[in-house]
Regions:
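Flexible, polar/low-complexity N-terminal or interdomain linker segments that lie immediately upstream
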Residues: 1-48, 55-60, 134-149
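Short active-site oxyanion
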Residues: 43-49, 64-65, 87, 113
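Short amphipathic alpha-helix with an adjacent loop that forms part of the alpha/beta core around
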Residues: 36-39, 75-84
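Short loop/helix-cap segments at secondary-structure boundaries that form the rim of catalytic
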Residues: 58-64, 79, 124
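Short hydrophobic/aromatic-enriched beta-strand-loop microsegments
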Residues: 66-73, 111-117
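Catalytic cysteine-centered active loop of the rhodanese-like fold, especially the PTP/DSP P-loop
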Residues: 79-125
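Terminal peptide-recognition signature
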Residues: 32, 51, 66, 107
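Short, hinge-like loop/turn segments at secondary-structure boundaries
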Residues: 67, 84-85, 131-135
Length: 149
């Protein structure tokens, strides 16, 4: 008996709905980099990238254009200045870190539209994208690898 088929297979309609739902919750480094290069995170753009780690870790290296907003500080009061017209992309260190999940959860619970960056800063770096350092957001320049998918 097939191990792959031992649990059954979803119908094409069920599979389509499942995978569409996954894409509604997550994005990957290549798609985020493309949006950053296209100006989607600039003033007037449609997304805001949030580094959910501590300010010290943000200063050591972060995605260019990201703002530092530790998940532990997110509350109705601290999010008052956030626009409800934006989509917030949360990230943390990556595998083994749930800061991005906690940040995304808190923002969603407060009524914001949000996505989580798959693999966090680890996969961002692994894909060859540059990081900014210090307390300023910085700007992404050309670089990284093209997604092979």
């Amino acid at each position: 008996m097939s191990h792959v088929l031992s649990t059954g297979v979803a119908s094409p309609q069920e599979a389509s709905a499942f995978f569409e739902a996954q894409l509604a919750f997550r994005t990957d480094p290549a798609d985020l980099a493309a949006d950053l290069l296209a100006g989607e995170a600039a003033e007037g753009g449609s997304i805001v990238v949030i580094d959910t780690r501590s300010p010290a870790h943000y200063a050591e290296g972060h995605i260019p254009g990201a703002i530092s907003f530790p998940h532990s500080t997110m509350s109705p009061t601290t999010t008052q200045g956030l626009s409800r017209d934006k989509v917030y992309v949360c990230y943390c260190d990556g595998i083994g870190c749930n800061g991005s999940t906690q940040g995304a959860y808190k923002l969603a619970a407060l009524g914001f539209r949000v996505k989580e960056l798959i693999g966090g800063l680890h996969w961002w770096r692994q894909d060859g994208f540059a990081v900014a350092t210090g307390s300023e957001a910085g700007v992404l320049l050309e670089g990284g690898i093209a997604c092979a998918c």
